């Protein structure tokens, strides 16, 4: 299920019961399993306008989304159908069918507004389905588009301006597709044939004037032009007679109106070819889990009496994914270290070199799976955890070395200790005989490979544990004069002091190596962070340029149509977008 989802039928994603929006947890589980990028196509429109038929066609099925055959609206809430994309391998097509707007049985305009807003927020292609032509009645029925700024926030800051809203809406909002059912007019304008797209643009033309009627006429048209600069229109003839309409999903295509069948084929082909993957600000690609998070965040805001905020949704998603990215990076680091390290290592440098390689790759894993890490909070957490893991490996390495050396010493010196117990060395000349045997075994110990970092430390500790025995043998050896015993004791003290100094120097060296490695770690974090932020900056600048380009096209249209004031207003918006501060540069961790 991880790569492809095979839903045999649609499932309710957001239930609309008793004027409350409730998320279906089973639908969320399905979204969680979709690791592929998702192309989200949502359709809205008045009830009983045939939305579900088009969505079934996109799913490649005759039935699925409920069509119904009466004046009652069948679809309640938002229904979801996830299918493999028929034309783009590696992508999943998520179809969202919504309940009919302005259902007389429901009588709740506010819920219609939220359904409309959610469809816009969740989709990469937004289809508005209506019956007949684009006249003033059709525009009045599309009043929801004029309320989008009252239903959706693009930024979380309370002082956000309409210009900021408009710019961010263009960056977030989907392609707008208007499907006109049972269309019976000839597509002509001023006596010349026009395309459905040209018909849409003609219908969105503004009227000059400042009276209330003109403002009312222009408002929905301005909103569509402003928020949806990428627009498409499809017209559909009536599919058949009234009897056929009541059982449309069961009728063979060759029994339907030929023009209607061709128009549906053209529509589905466009959606499959040109509907893009759902993305968020900064070019963030949405997959199943990310879509799930958006659904939860938006519905939670609505149910709490707040406006769904696009920025907050992205930041919430970033919190979830960045936390998971830290864990993914740490898991990768541990797996690589455990696979490649052979403990105990002979030197600390050997372990630190491996740590540095695995750490660099772990940071790459984090960078690949994270985004919008505000103030590098999660990268700092990753750095702290990697340092702790490094220290744990250093300790484990030393512990394993200590245990191995302890076992080796016990094995090598076992016979010598047995001889001591038997009194072999309690005789004249016994001390130097003991010392000779001890030095032979010490040499064997030193020559034995694979002891690790604690080799000298453990040898010193072992000898320290036997100091009383050596001291006793020295004092009891009657072949030695007091002067010779004194000289030997001084030698032993000097050796002990030298060993202590070596141990101290080794500790200092270890500390310096760890500090140097910490600096290298910091530099690696900064290097990858700088590269990622530069890439994100380029993506944001490209997105800003795309928004400006779309607005410039709209400004040019307004200018050509003689709307100087509206064109000037849009020009001012464009200049404000251009003067927006660039994404902030990298900060020190």
From Swiss-Prot:
Q: Which family does it belong to?
A: Belongs to the TRAFAC class dynamin-like GTPase superfamily. GB1/RHD3 GTPase family. GB1 subfamily.
* Lineage of producing organism: Eukaryota, Metazoa, Chordata, Craniata, Vertebrata
Q: Source gene?
A: Gbp1
Q: Which reaction does it catalyse?
A: GTP + H2O = GDP + phosphate + H(+); GDP + H2O = GMP + phosphate + H(+)
As for PTM, the annotation reads: Isoprenylation of mouse GBP1 is incomplete. It persistently exists in the cell as a mixture of C20-modified and (more predominantly) unmodified form. Isoprenylation is required for proper subcellular location.
Q: Which organism is it from?
A: Mus musculus
**Documented EC number(s):** 3.6.1.-, 3.6.5.-
Q: Where is the lipid attached (S-farnesyl cysteine)?
A: 586
Q: GB1/RHD3-type G domain: which residues?
A: 35-276
Phosphothreonine, modified sites? 587
Positions of post-translational Cysteine methyl ester modification: 586
Which UniProt keyword terms apply here? Answer: Antimicrobial, Antiviral defense, Cell membrane, Cytoplasm, Cytoplasmic vesicle, Golgi apparatus, GTP-binding, Hydrolase, Immunity, Innate immunity, Lipoprotein, Membrane, Methylation, Nucleotide-binding, Phosphoprotein, Prenylation, Secreted
Q: How does it sit in the membrane?
A: Lipid-anchor
Write the protein's name: Guanylate-binding protein 1
Q: Where is the lipid attached (S-geranylgeranyl cysteine)?
A: 586
Q: Where are the transmembrane segments?
A: none
Top-level taxon in the UniProt lineage: Eukaryota
């Amino acid at each position: 299920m991880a790569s492809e989802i095979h839903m045999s039928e649609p499932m309710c994603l957001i239930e609309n019961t008793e004027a409350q929006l409730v998320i279906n947890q089973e639908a969320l589980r399905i979204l969680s399993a979709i690791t592929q990028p998702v192309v989200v196509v949502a359709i809205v429109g008045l009830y009983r306008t045939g939305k579900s038929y088009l969505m079934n066609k996109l799913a490649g099925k005759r039935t699925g989304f409920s069509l119904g055959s009466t004046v009652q609206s069948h679809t309640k809430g938002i229904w979801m159908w996830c299918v493999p994309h028929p034309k783009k391998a590696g992508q999943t097509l998520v179809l969202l069918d919504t309940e009919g707007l302005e259902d007389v049985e429901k009588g709740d305009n506010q819920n219609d507004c939220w359904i409309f807003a959610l469809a816009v927020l969740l989709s990469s292609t937004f289809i508005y389905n209506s019956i007949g032509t684009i006249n003033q009645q059709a525009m009045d029925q599309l009043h929801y588009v004029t309320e989008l700024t009252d239903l959706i926030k693009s930024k979380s800051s309370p002082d956000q301006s309409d210009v900021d809203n408009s710019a961010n809406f263009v960056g977030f909002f989907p392609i707008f597709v208007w499907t006109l059912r049972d269309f019976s007019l000839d597509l002509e304008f001023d006596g010349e044939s026009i395309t459905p797209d040209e018909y849409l643009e003609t219908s969105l033309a503004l009227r000059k004037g400042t009276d209330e009627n003109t403002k009312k006429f222009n408002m929905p048209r301005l909103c569509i032009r402003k928020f949806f600069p990428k627009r498409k229109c499809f017209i559909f003839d009536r599919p058949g007679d009234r009897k056929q309409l009541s059982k449309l999903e069961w009728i063979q295509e060759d029994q339907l109106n030929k023009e209607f069948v061709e128009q549906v084929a053209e529509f589905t082909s466009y959606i499959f070819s040109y509907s893009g993957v759902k993305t968020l600000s900064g070019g963030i690609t949405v997959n199943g889990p990310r879509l799930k998070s958006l659904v939860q965040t938006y519905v939670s805001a609505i149910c709490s009496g707040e406006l769904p905020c696009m920025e907050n949704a992205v930041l919430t998603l970033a919190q979830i994914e960045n936390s998971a990215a830290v864990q993914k990076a740490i898991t990768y680091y541990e797996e690589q270290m455990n696979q490649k390290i052979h403990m105990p290592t002979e030197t600390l440098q050997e372990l630190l070199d491996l740590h540095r390689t695995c750490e660099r790759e772990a940071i790459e894993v984090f960078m690949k799976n994270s985004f919008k890490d505000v103030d590098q909070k999660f990268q700092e957490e990753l750095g702290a955890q990697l340092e702790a893991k490094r220290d744990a490996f250093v300790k484990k390495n030393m512990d394993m070395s200590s245990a191995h050396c302890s076992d080796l010493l016990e094995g090598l010196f076992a016979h010598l200790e047995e001889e001591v117990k038997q009194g072999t060395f309690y005789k004249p000349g016994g001390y130097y005989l003991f010392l000779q045997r001890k030095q032979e075994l010490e040499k064997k110990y030193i020559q034995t490979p694979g002891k690790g970092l604690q080799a000298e430390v453990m040898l010193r500790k072992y000898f320290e544990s036997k100091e009383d025995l050596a001291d006793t043998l020295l004092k009891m050896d009657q072949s030695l004069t007091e002067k010779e015993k004194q000289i030997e004791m001084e030698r032993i003290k000097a050796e002990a002091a030298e060993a202590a100094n070596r141990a101290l120097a080794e500790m200092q060296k270890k500390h310096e190596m760890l500090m140097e490695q910490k600096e290298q770690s910091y530099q690696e974090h900064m290097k990858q962070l700088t590269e990622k932020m530069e890439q994100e900056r380029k993506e944001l600048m490209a997105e800003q340029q795309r928004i400006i380009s779309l607005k410039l096209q709209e400004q040019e249209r307004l200018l050509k149509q003689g709307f100087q004031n509206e064109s000037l207003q849009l020009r001012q918006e464009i200049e404000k977008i251009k003067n927006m501060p660039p994404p902030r540069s990298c900060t020190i961790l």
